[in-house]
C-alpha cells in the first residue's frame, strides 16, 4: 500500500470524525493523532485509582507467580478482572471510537514493567511490523499506572512516521530489549523524538506504524504501563495466525474460523485463564513467524 494511499485513508478518517461530535477527544487531539501518529496526555482515571491498580498488580504477582511474571505478561486482562475493566473503560473506548469508529475489537494486551534501576529498554520500532494484520489502521492506548518520564523510561515517538509504510527492522534478540525479537530500526534521528510524559492514570494513544522507543528506567521506582494493543475495526483480519479477539463495542466480528474471548467474571476465572493460554500460543506463533530464535514471551 503506497504512501499516498495511506495518507488518503488518514485524511478520510480525519474529515469523517471531525464532522461528528467526539466523545472524549477534542478535535485538536484527533487532528494531532492523524498528523503526528500519537496523542497524549488523556486522563482516564485519578492518580490514586491508577496507583491502586499498580499495587493490585504487585499483589497478584505474589499470589499467582506462575500466571504473571516477566515472561508471562501478555493478555493479562483474561486472567484478572481488574485489568479486563481497563479494556472496557468507557473513557478509553470512547476515545478509540473517536479515532476508529463505533465497531471495536481488541487484539491483545501487554503489561510493560521496567524495574527500578534496570537496563531494560525498547528499541526503535513500529508495532505493526510483526502483528500480521491485513491492514495497519489500528491504534494502541498505553495507560500509565506509575510516573512515566525521561528518568523512568517513558516512550519517545517520532512525529509523522506513521504515514510511511513498514520499514526494515533488524532482529537482535538483545537480552535487555523488552521487544519479542529485540527488533530495531537503524539510523533514527533521535533529536526528532517527543517524550510522552504521563502521570499515573493518564494514557497516550499511538498508531500501529509510528516509530517509537523507550529508554531504561534509571529511577528507584517501578515504571508500569498497560498497553491495549490494539483496538481495530471488525473488518481487519489476522493473516499469520488465528483470528482471536476480545469484543469491545458495536458490531461483533464474524470470523468463521475465529474465536471471541470471554470476559473474566473474577480474578483467575478458569474459563478465561484457559483461553489466555490459547491466545498467547497463537500470539507467539504470529510474533515469531519465520524466526529461528524464540523467547519465552
Which ranges hold each PLM region?
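Double-stranded beta-helix
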Residues: 150-215
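Non-heme Fe(II)/2-oxoglutarate
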Residues: 63, 210-211, 215-297
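A short beta-loop-beta micro-motif enriched in histidine and acidic residues
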Residues: 126-138, 191-192, 198, 221-222
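Short, conserved beta-strand element in jelly-roll/cupin
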Residues: 132-150, 197, 228-232
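Active-site region of the double-stranded beta-helix
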Residues: 102, 128-133, 143-154, 160-162
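Histidine-centered catalytic micro-motifs
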Residues: 121-129, 205-215, 232
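Non-heme Fe(II)-dependent double-stranded beta-helix
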Residues: 21-133, 169-170
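Fe(II)/2-oxoglutarate
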Residues: 3-35, 273, 288-297
Amino acid at each position: 500500500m503506497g504512501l499516498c494511499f495511506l495518507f488518503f485513508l488518514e485524511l478520510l478518517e480525519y474529515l469523517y470524525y471531525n464532522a461528528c461530535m467526539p466523545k472524549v477527544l477534542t478535535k485538536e487531539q484527533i487532528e494531532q493523532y492523524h498528523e503526528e501518529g500519537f496523542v497524549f496526555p488523556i486522563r482516564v482515571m485519578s492518580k490514586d485509582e491508577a496507583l491502586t491498580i499498580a499495587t493490585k498488580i504487585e499483589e497478584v504477582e505474589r499470589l499467582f507467580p506462575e500466571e504473571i511474571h516477566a515472561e508471562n505478561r501478555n493478555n493479562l486482562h483474561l486472567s484478572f478482572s481488574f485489568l479486563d475493566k481497563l479494556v472496557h473503560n468507557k473513557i478509553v473506548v470512547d476515545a478509540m471510537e473517536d479515532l476508529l469508529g463505533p465497531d471495536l475489537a481488541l487484539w491483545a494486551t501487554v503489561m510493560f514493567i521496567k524495574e527500578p534501576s534496570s537496563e531494560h529498554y525498547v528499541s526503535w520500532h513500529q508495532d505493526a511490523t510483526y502483528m500480521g494484520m491485513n491492514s495497519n489502521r489500528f491504534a494502541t492506548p498505553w495507560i500509565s499506572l506509575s510516573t512515566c518520564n525521561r528518568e523512568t523510561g517513558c516512550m519517545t515517538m517520532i512525529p509523522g512516521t506513521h504515514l510511511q509504510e513498514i520499514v526494515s527492522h533488524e532482529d537482535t534478540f538483545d537480552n535487555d530489549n523488552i521487544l519479542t525479537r529485540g527488533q530495531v530500526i537503524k539510523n533514527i534521528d533521535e533529536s526528532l523524538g517527543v517524550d510522552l510524559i504521563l502521570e499515573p492514570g493518564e494514557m497516550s494513544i499511538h498508531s500501529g506504524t509510528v516509530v517509537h522507543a523507550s529508554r531504561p528506567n534509571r529511577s528507584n521506582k517501578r515504571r508500569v504501563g498497560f498497553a491495549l494493543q490494539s483496538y481495530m475495526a471488525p473488518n481487519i483480519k489476522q493473516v499469520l495466525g488465528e483470528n482471536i479477539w476480545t469484543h469491545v463495542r458495536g458490531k461483533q466480528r464474524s470470523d468463521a474460523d475465529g474465536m471471541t474471548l470471554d470476559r473474566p467474571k473474577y480474578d483467575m476465572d478458569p474459563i478465561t485463564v484457559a483461553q489466555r493460554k490459547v491466545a498467547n500460543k497463537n500470539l507467539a506463533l504470529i510474533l515469531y513467524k519465520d524466526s529461528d530464535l524464540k523467547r519465552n514471551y
